[in-house]
A protein has these predicted regions:
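A generic structural signal for short beta-strands and their flanking turns/coil linkers
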Residues: 5, 35, 44, 62-64, ...
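Core segments of cupin and vicinal oxygen chelate
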Residues: 9-47
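Vicinal oxygen chelate
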Residues: 14-15, 67-117
Length: 119
């Protein structure tokens, strides 16, 4: 799984993480161990590490989330549709941010089973 970006993040349940990232989001399953699972997402490598520590839920999208930059509107819409079809937990519903400015973009935030935020 060649990757251009690698991100490691904590999860409380590897089985739930695999179901969310592979079966629902469509990531490619990579290496697995008893403490971590590797996923491929659009050429990037995500590594879910099992954490015994309680994972604090964030109070907002900052300072910690990870996002996928999609260059075509239809890619974004397909992912939003997939998330809605699977009844994923939206931290923020699909919407347009900063309308009429040079940084205008479409966005939504999902929350994985461990409370990690994905844009």
């Amino acid at each position: 799984m060649p990757a251009i970006f690698h991100l490691a993040f904590p999860v409380h349940d590897l089985t739930a993480a695999k179901q969310f990232y592979v079966e629902v989001l469509g990531c490619v399953l990579g290496r697995e161990s008893s403490t971590a699972v590797t996923f491929g997402l659009a050429g990037h490598q995500l590594v879910a590490h099992l954490s015994e520590d309680e994972l604090d839920r964030q109070k907002g999208i900052y300072p910690r989330h990870f996002g996928l930059v999609l260059t075509r509107e239809e890619q974004w819409q397909a992912l939003a549709d997939r998330a809605q079809a699977h009844h994923l937990r939206f931290y923020q519903q699909p919407r347009r941010r900063f309308s009429g400015t040079r940084i205008e973009h479409r966005t939504f935030f999902l929350e994985d089973p461990s409370g990690n935020l994905l844009e």
